[in-house]
Regions:
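Class I S-adenosyl-L-methionine-dependent methyltransferase catalytic core
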Residues: 1-203
């Protein structure tokens, strides 16, 4: 596979951070399975829990070879790096916070993750410029009014067979998703997080 990286050894798990406290995320499957990555801890940052991420990628299947993925609110980058670990041909990670962007770039370098692109900017605006995506990750700040514009942007750029992953502080039912031409394919609750895998109504 183009851009294929080698699994990293134990000593390479440690990444020098720019500043602030840090914690770890663990990649669950694929090329970098069990790799632990240190990530910068920021106020309001809410990484997708390991259990939720594992369930999501069980839903998706273990092999994402050739998929084009886009994470509009990347945060720690856990979802995008997991997709790249499982063979995605591209995983675009967008984040507005400068410190998190710098950290995502360090992780990309550490993993030699050529399939990963890191961009700083407005995730929704950059999402609108995409075409024919296989998978869009939407995990916006829960206290921001971003769910409506994010869903509208996502549904306009995914393939007819594409998928949208949505994390939210409340469950979204099919009737809530009708204006976006989406429906719930799979869902789960983990603590205060509701995770949804959505498909187009025409799918």
């Amino acid at each position: 596979m183009k851009g294929e990286a080698q699994p990293i050894g134990r000593k390479k798990h440690e990444i020098r951070l720019i500043g602030g406290k840090n914690h770890e995320i663990r990649l669950i499957g694929g090329l970098w399975k069990r790799t632990k990555l240190k990530v910068l801890d920021k106020p309001g940052l809410r990484p997708t829990p390991d259990r939720v991420r594992e369930t999501l990628f069980n839903w998706l299947g273990h092999n994402l070879t050739g998929w084009k993925c886009f994470d509009a609110f990347a945060g720690t980058g856990a979802l995008g790096f997991e997709a790249a670990s499982r063979g995605a041909v591209s995983a675009t990670l967008v984040e507005q916070d400068a410190g998190l962007v710098a950290q995502l770039k360090l992780l990309k370098t550490q993993l030699n993750a050529e399939a990963v692109q890191v961009q700083r900017g407005d995730g929704i605006a950059l999402l609108k410029a995409q075409r024919d995506l296989d998978l869009v990750f939407l995990d916006p700040p829960f206290d921001a009014a971003l769910f409506d514009p994010a869903l509208r942007a996502a549904v306009s750029v995914v393939k007819p067979t594409g998928l949208v992953y949505l994390e939210a502080p409340k469950p979204w039912a099919d009737e809530d998703l009708l204006p976006y031409r989406l429906k719930v394919h799979r869902h789960l609750k983990a603590g205060v997080v509701y995770a949804h895998l959505l498909v187009l109504l025409s799918a």
